[in-house]
């Protein structure tokens, strides 16, 4: 949920309270209707920054592990699996946008090398379709065929996400070459802490916006709190709004400092990224390599036979 910190003097209290209430209602509806990874799609042309950082980390502040597994070597025009694992404790519950507790969702963004793309349905085997399940993969941009997003989906069911990938064929694609390619992935579990506009969700710590003494803590009927801080220097009052799902750590009469945490950290999720490398191998090189190995094996066999023949001749001479 989006929140605002309001500063006001006593004659303005009624107007400021009404404005704050309307703002919370409007922004709450917005946060519920929006979902990751749409935030990244709407705000960034490319999900991977020049530094290598995936932009999802701008909203998901906690660092958690993510792993991707791909074959070491693949052939041209071949369908292979890219398996993304997003591990977490299935017993964990997160704070939802309405303030209630619920299970964690997961999401991922897969950045393939240029020329690699999602395999068409008619190229996916029944076994691979079973691994994919009912997942829906969406292009990051309509004109981009090598970057895909998935989610949010229930983490209980999709801790492991399987992407069906089609490798390019350098014979028909001039931009593809027989090289080693990196594949990047970013994955998150749980909701983010920051919205793209910079405002906080209700899944993070809220800090005091002023020093002073807690004059009053008001519990709102629809959830959340209003913490009124009286500034000791000029007797102004500052209202800090806590969205639904968060409980204050302070009590009335407490002295607090600027940026002191007013709540605990409710976040149990996090974001991580990983990279894997895959070699697009030329089939002719494989054939040459197989021929080379076969030649070595045949040479070894001939040497063994020649040795046995020589030993047999020597044994015959000895017997004579």
UniProtKB/Swiss-Prot annotation:
Binds 1 heme group covalently. Pfam families: Apocytochr_F_C, Apocytochr_F_N. Its cofactor is heme. It is a single-pass membrane protein. Coiled coil: none annotated. Its main location: plastid. The chain crosses the membrane at residues 286-306. Residues 1-35 form the signal peptide. SUPFAM superfamilies: Cytochrome f subunit of the cytochrome b6f complex, transmembrane anchor, Cytochrome f, large domain, Rudiment single hybrid motif. One of its GO terms (molecular function) is iron ion binding. Keywords: Electron transport, Heme, Iron, Membrane, Metal-binding, Photosynthesis, Plastid, Signal, Thylakoid, Transmembrane, Transmembrane helix, Transport. Disulfide bonds: none annotated. Heme binds at residues 36, 56, 59-60. It is found in: Plastid thylakoid membrane. GO terms for cellular component: chloroplast thylakoid membrane. GO terms for biological process: photosynthesis. Belongs to the cytochrome f family. The 4 large subunits of the cytochrome b6-f complex are cytochrome b6, subunit IV (17 kDa polypeptide, petD), cytochrome f and the Rieske protein, while the 4 small subunits are PetG, PetL, PetM and PetN. The complex functions as a dimer. Component of the cytochrome b6-f complex, which mediates electron transfer between photosystem II (PSII) and photosystem I (PSI), cyclic electron flow around PSI, and state transitions. This is Cytochrome f. It comes from Cuscuta obtusiflora (Peruvian dodder). The lineage of its organism: Eukaryota, Viridiplantae, Streptophyta, Embryophyta, Tracheophyta. The gene is petA.
């Amino acid at each position: 949920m989006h929140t605002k910190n309001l500063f006001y003097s006593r004659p303005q209290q009624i107007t400021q309270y009404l404005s704050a209430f309307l703002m919370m209602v409007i922004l709450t509806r917005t946060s519920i209707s929006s979902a990751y990874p749409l935030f990244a799609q709407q705000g960034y042309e490319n999900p991977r920054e020049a530094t290598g950082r995936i932009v999802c980390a701008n909203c998901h502040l906690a660092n958690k592990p993510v792993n991707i597994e791909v074959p070491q070597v693949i052939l041209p025009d071949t369908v292979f699996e890219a398996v993304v694992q997003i591990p977490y404790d299935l017993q964990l519950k997160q704070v939802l946008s309405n303030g209630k507790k619920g299970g964690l969702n997961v999401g991922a963004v897969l950045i393939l090398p240029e020329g690699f793309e999602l395999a068409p349905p008619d190229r996916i085997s029944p076994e691979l379709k079973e691994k994919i399940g009912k997942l829906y993969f969406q292009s990051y941009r309509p004109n981009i065929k090598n970057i895909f997003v998935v989610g949010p989906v229930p983490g209980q069911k999709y801790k492991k996400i399987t992407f069906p990938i089609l490798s390019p064929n350098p014979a028909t694609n001039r931009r593809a070459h027989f090289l080693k390619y990196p594949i990047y992935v970013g994955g998150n579990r749980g909701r983010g802490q920051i919205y793209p506009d910079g405002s906080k969700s209700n899944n993070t710590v809220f800090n005091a916006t002023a020093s002073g003494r807690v004059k009053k803590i008001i519990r709102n009927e629809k959830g959340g709190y209003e913490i009124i801080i009286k500034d000791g220097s000029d007797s102004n009052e500052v209202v800090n709004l806590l969205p639904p799902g968060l409980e204050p750590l302070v009590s009335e009469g407490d002295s607090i400092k600027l940026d002191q945490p007013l709540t605990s950290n409710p976040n149990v999720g996090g974001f991580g990224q990983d990279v894997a490398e895959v070699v697009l191998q030329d089939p002719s090189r494989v054939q040459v390599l197989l021929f080379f190995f076969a030649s070595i094996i045949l040479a070894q066999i001939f040497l063994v036979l020649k040795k046995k023949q020589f030993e047999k001749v020597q044994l015959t001479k000895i017997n004579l």
